[in-house]
Amino acid sequence: MKIDILTLFPEMFAGPFSSSILKRAQERGLVEIGLINIRDFSTNKHHTVDDAPYGGGAGMVMGPEALFGAVEHVARKYGSKPGRVVLMCPQGIPFTQAYAADLAREETIVLVCGHYEGIDERVREALVTDEISIGDYVLTGGELPAMVVVDAVARLVPGVLGEALSVMEESFSNGLLEYPHFTRPREFRGLKVPEVLLSGHHEEIRKWRRRQSLLRTLERRPEMLKQAGLTREDREILKELLASLNELDLS
């Protein structure tokens, strides 16, 4: 997979992309990440990319010239238009695990990091295929959201993570929050690992994990249950959990 990031501050990405899973994914040729400085495509001698907004108002707006030039540069590099051109934007669609999985199916994507008050609307109309928000808050620029998107998408590329099962069982991948994890020692400062996890009984462990996953989702993100692919067994467990929680509320 090839990911190109259009940014005014390429140096911001050095740390996150040169360590851990993303570093190994690049070394193995599973993911290629290109950092493109938008200023390199400015058409004026001062390499500025922003200007005052027509109609007045506060702040500056990123103009179309450099952004068009940068996207066209990526198209020339690959010999075709990028699969998706994604703008990091607080007005965008909320970024979810399902959205990450959708982007991971593309061969090439371009992430555009906005700055200032925003970008010229003609860039949106002519180039941008997606607009993504990572939350209902405003950041200084699109660089941090782009890092989040790259991390979430790259780990879904086949081969990047060692075990496909691990990816499938993570929070949100199956519509539920993930179950609790434990490792050695069996007891730490009086806190013990649940006995079922030490039993070696795979079916009982599966049931316990599923129950815990349902409980966490019910307690922390109940709205997710409406979209989760619940089985008949899941629904029975939820009835039991709701009854238990109601008893606690009444006691």
Curated annotation (Swiss-Prot):
GO annotation terms (biological process): tRNA N1-guanine methylation
InterPro entries: Alpha/beta_knot_MTases (IPR029028), tRNA_m1G_MeTrfase_C_sf (IPR023148), tRNA_m1G_MeTrfase_TrmD (IPR002649), tRNA_m1G_MTases_N (IPR029026), tRNA_MeTrfase_TRMD/TRM10 (IPR016009)
Principal location: cytoplasm
Keyword annotations from UniProtKB, A to Z: Cytoplasm, Methyltransferase, S-adenosyl-L-methionine, Transferase, tRNA processing
Amino-acid positions noted as binding S-adenosyl-L-methionine in the UniProt annotation, renumbered to this chain: G114, I134, G135, D136, Y137, V138, L139
Pfam families in alphabetical order: tRNA_m1G_MT (PF01746)
Enzyme kind, highest EC tier: transferase
GO cellular component: cytosol
GO molecular function, one term: tRNA (guanine(37)-N1)-methyltransferase activity
EC number: 2.1.1.228
Reaction it catalyzes: guanosine(37) in tRNA + S-adenosyl-L-methionine = N(1)-methylguanosine(37) in tRNA + S-adenosyl-L-homocysteine + H(+)
Compartments, as annotated in UniProt: Cytoplasm
HAMAP family assigned to the protein according to its UniProt record, in alphabetical order: TrmD
Stated family: Belongs to the RNA methyltransferase TrmD family.
Oligomer status and interactors: Homodimer.
Stated role: Specifically methylates guanosine-37 in various tRNAs.
Designated name of the protein: tRNA (guanine-N(1)-)-methyltransferase
Organism: Pelotomaculum thermopropionicum (strain DSM 13744 / JCM 10971 / SI)
Encoding gene per record: trmD
